[in-house]
Amino acid sequence: MPDRRQHRGPHPDDAALFGRPDVLHTLRLAAGDLAWLLGRQYAPTAALTLVGNHYQLHARQRQALARAVAAPAVAQARRQRQVPTAALAGMSLYVDGFNQLITIEVALSGGLVLRGHDGVLRDLASVHGTYRTITETPTALQALGTYLAPLHLQAVHVFLDAKVSNAGRLASRMRALATTHAWPWHVLLVPSADAVLRQTEAIVATSDSGILDTAVRWFDLAAAVVTQQVPQAWCVDLDVPPPLV
């Protein structure tokens, strides 16, 4: 069945699973326990099952923990390689195109975004191998360009997986927008964006944990855009110690 969604808004159960203070307290406790286990070399799948069963978490809550939680040493190592906005002037930025755009689209759609233990902003969208533009796509692209324009980057290289459906159309749309606004964007269709981003020494923009762990330097572009351009975004912060009770 074709994907006919016009938005990447919240899952019907998200208000109950992430919206109440008591639920957030439980999730933060669970996140802390999962980080503790990962830091002691527990297998990620086994650790998530153990924590999820203990706290009786819904599958979507477990998915959130899997994306947002890392072993403390891993999270710290990622933070140490993060670059501030001020360091971008005159540099080239390599952007994980679908990864960053979809997070901005989710935020604009009122969907849930997560801030993890490594400080990175992520979404819970399930877009694997297929992509279609939604109502918020033009606004998301404009927000991306509006944020990047004053940073005086030498170039912004946006990598899109060629095998993903509609990648070519999105690339054309981004190129046209960049030409209209004289943005220094180079939009590239490649066999694997992950492979390119894992190998470069340039500053990368992604929330993919595997890429972050190999990146020499990285910038949380989606988080910066959402913070500046989407102040109403629904962000659940799991990078907060659970309150004492």
Residue map of PLM features:
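Charge-biased, low-complexity intrinsically disordered regions
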Residues: 1-93, 100-245
